[in-house]
Amino acid sequence: TALTELRCENNQLTSLDVSKNTALTELRCENNQLTSLNVSGAAALTDLICYNNQLTSLDLSTNTLLDHLRGWSNQLTSLDVSNNTALTELFCSVNQLTSLDVSNNTALTELFCSGNQLTSLDVSANTDLTNLHCGSNQLTSLDVSSNTALNYLYCYSNQLTSLDVSSNTNLERLWCYE
């Protein structure tokens, strides 16, 4: 269809299928009760805002143009963004993620993954990161030496024993309390 923008936020939707909406570039479906979201055929999608739902999985493998993903406060147990190389903003806080691979997402400037169950996080390939929120996880180490553009680093409530920010000369805010 010719539909390019769909806003259906703040309802009580439990499922949404936009797989036939090939021209869709923006989907806002936040604040619903979604347990199923099919965006597989929406290859033009650049903005997906689906936070505060009940999603346990999200297949983004065909959404290679995706630039912004805001999917916090769901029940995601895994999130594969390896094909989403255009991502600049990834917000996946307050889910149930135990791992997150952002090595292919070299355009990322903002990564919010707080409130998950991450035991490790490799951001060495994300050299454009300016904003990293990874608090309230189970990280035992965090290497931000490659992230020289970082302005904000929130890594509180983890299990870090050391943190080297000597390369992060642009850092304006650092929260690493327990």
Regions found by a protein language model. Give the residues of each.
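Short "repeat-start/strand-capping" segments in structured domains, especially the N-termini
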Residues: 2-3, 21-24, 42-45, 63-66, ...
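Consensus "Asn ladder" position of solenoid repeat domains
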Residues: 11, 32, 53, 71-74, ...
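Leucine-rich solenoid repeat scaffolds
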Residues: 162-178
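Leucine-biased recognition of intrinsically disordered, low-complexity hydrophobic segments
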Residues: 3-6, 13, 34, 55, ...
